[in-house]
């Protein structure tokens, strides 16, 4: 997977390894959180004289659309919570970063029943639009541009019932305090701005 990240989207070895490791860590942490949520759901909670049992369950079909610049980490940040909570996922990889999906397909086949994780390939406008028009998507999970999110929502026949998980064109300022270590701060700001040629929402 690391080599495929390097070959297809041009990440260097260090950044590709970091993306892979971050993804594995994220999956493990998500599983831990799910177990905690599951345990909490077995107990009644008291609040202001109200005794309640909180149960969380699947929402239905989730359409996951990840970005090309972090095709493993950011896409799995959408996909993994969806399937862990019992949803069915339709997952469309970004147009760049599809080669790494091949070895992962085998893992999905071994780990989940048929139809739980569904992967479609193609251009976003041509693939995602007709899927949204069916009205069978319960959750749109997208990391990308706000114009894409708006146009996809508008295609859904019941967009008032559509749940959204969106990460859209972030801009992140760096606030440097008077007591900051300037050498460390400058290095971190440069790394944050210029890693992967600045093609990242945290630049």
Annotate each predicted stretch with a short phrase:
Residues 1-50:
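N-terminal Rossmann-like NAD(P)+-binding subdomain of aldehyde/semialdehyde dehydrogenases
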Residues 5, 86, 117, 140, ...:
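Residue-level signal for inorganic ion chemistry
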Residues 27, 101-104, 131, 152:
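Hydrophobic packing residues within well-ordered alpha-helices of enzyme cores
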Residues 40-115:
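Conserved small-residue-rich beta-alpha loop and adjacent elements
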Residues 51-52, 119-138:
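A structured beta-alpha segment of the ubiquitous adenosine-cofactor-binding alpha/beta core
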Residues 80, 138-143:
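Periplasmic-binding protein-like
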Residues 111-112, 139, 147-203:
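ALDH superfamily catalytic-core signature
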